[in-house]
């Protein structure tokens, strides 16, 4: 397939085989969009920067951390990003994609069947507030992330209960302020977590500022978290 209009910043991060898989994924997402309103980010920079690059660069940026061969959780996966992007670039990892909307999980299942992923991929239609209190899911992941779901404090309440003691939570944020940093520190203190690292980047093609906050458990998260459905969103810690 042709590489027209794919930003150089992406081409420098992924292999020829991975480019082909991302192009196949783009085609299938467009097919799905003809039947259901899955995402508006399907063409040009909307796809290659806002979806692909934004999903994969954090796992290339923290060079002191090995993100390969891990158990990976994407919370609120939507149309499959960042989870499917991570799957393409980390084929030895086991992937769990969860979303509360059946329309979204049905779409992701279709994509998984259509694309030649090498991973073991699980797609679950449920709320993280429910799954986090199941012994088969809690404290079970090396990496957990969510993108475009909620504020960092709420997202931390979703992520930390799912992580193994040595695991990492990957928080996708826009511009990062001192107030947000203080609020996150307060939340992490309650959840027995800590900030491990942070990186900021200007996305290609003037797509804005992106901050990635890496969080990590200090101890296992108290069992009462996450709270019941809706509480983390309405009343952040």
Curated annotation (Swiss-Prot):
S-adenosyl-L-methionine binds at residues 76, 81, 128-129, 147. One of its GO terms (cellular component) is cytosol. GO terms for molecular function: rRNA (guanine-N7-)-methyltransferase activity. InterPro entries: rRNA_ssu_MeTfrase_G, SAM-dependent_MTases_sf. It holds the Pfam family GidB. Belongs to the methyltransferase superfamily. RNA methyltransferase RsmG family. This is Ribosomal RNA small subunit methyltransferase G. It comes from Prochlorococcus marinus (strain MIT 9215).
């Amino acid at each position: 397939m042709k590489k027209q209009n794919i930003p150089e910043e992406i081409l420098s991060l992924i292999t020829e085989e991975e480019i082909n898989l991302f192009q196949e994924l783009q085609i299938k997402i467009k097919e799905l969009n003809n039947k259901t309103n899955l995402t508006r980010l399907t063409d040009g920079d909307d796809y290659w920067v806002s979806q692909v690059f934004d999903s994969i660069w954090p796992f290339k940026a923290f060079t002191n951390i090995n993100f390969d061969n891990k158990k990976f959780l994407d919370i609120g996966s939507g149309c499959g990003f960042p989870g499917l992007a991570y799957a393409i670039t980390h084929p030895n990892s086991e992937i769990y994609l969860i979303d509360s909307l059946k329309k979204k999980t049905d779409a992701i299942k279709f994509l998984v069947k259509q694309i030649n992923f090498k991973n073991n991929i699980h797609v679950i239609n449920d709320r993280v507030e429910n799954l986090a209190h199941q012994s088969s899911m809690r404290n079970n992941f090396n990496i957990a992330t969510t993108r475009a779901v909620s504020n960092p404090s709420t997202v931390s309440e979703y992520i930390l209960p799912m992580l193994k003691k040595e695991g990492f939570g990957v928080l996708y944020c826009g511009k990062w302020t001192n107030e947000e940093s203080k609020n996150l520190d307060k939340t992490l203190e309650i959840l027995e977590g800590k900030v491990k690292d942070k990186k900021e980047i200007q996305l290609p093609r003037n797509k804005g500022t992106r901050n990635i906050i890496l969080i990590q458990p200090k101890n296992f998260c108290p069992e009462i978290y996450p709270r019941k459905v809706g509480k983390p969103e309405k009343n952040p810690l």
